[in-house]
Amino acid sequence: MIVGRNSNNLDSNDIARAALESLAENTSDGVTAPLFWGVLLGFPGVLIYKFVNTADSMIGYKNKRYRDFGWASARLDDLVNYIPARLTSFMYAMISRNTLKVLRITFRDASQHRSPNAGWPETSVAASIGVKLSGPRIYEGVKTNDPWLNNDGRDPTGSDLFSGLKLFDRFLWAITFLLLLCSIISFL
């Protein structure tokens, strides 16, 4: 399972929404954050980051079973992803077709997300491809009233997944270019 919500009753728009949210958040967790901590602290930084991130994935829940000891891993994960989430968001905005609009929407909406970090890349992806993400959903049998990110966007469809993947592809090329540029500069 790649999403935390109940997927039994999702329609195609809900599935597209969940996939785009996962793509956006996992760009930060799986690409930007390991690179950030690797550049900052070397291989030990990557190992520490992945340990914290994995612990959060396994036990960082607010349910009865994990509440008493999972909160620490969740808060630590929030801390180590604070800068990488915003870097990811900024990079998505820079490679979008309308950078200023994406930045404006991101600064307006990102903090409305229930996560202190996930809202940043999710809002930037939503604004970049013109869809709305987050919003009400069902977690563990309870309907949430989460606000929409990029509320003026349309409901995502299957074709928006291709737009999201194209955006992610441009993101990877931009990161590769920046890493090569930094490597060249460090040798000068």
Which residue stretches match the model-derived regions?
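Hydrophobic alpha-helical transmembrane segments
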Residues: 1-48, 52, 60-188
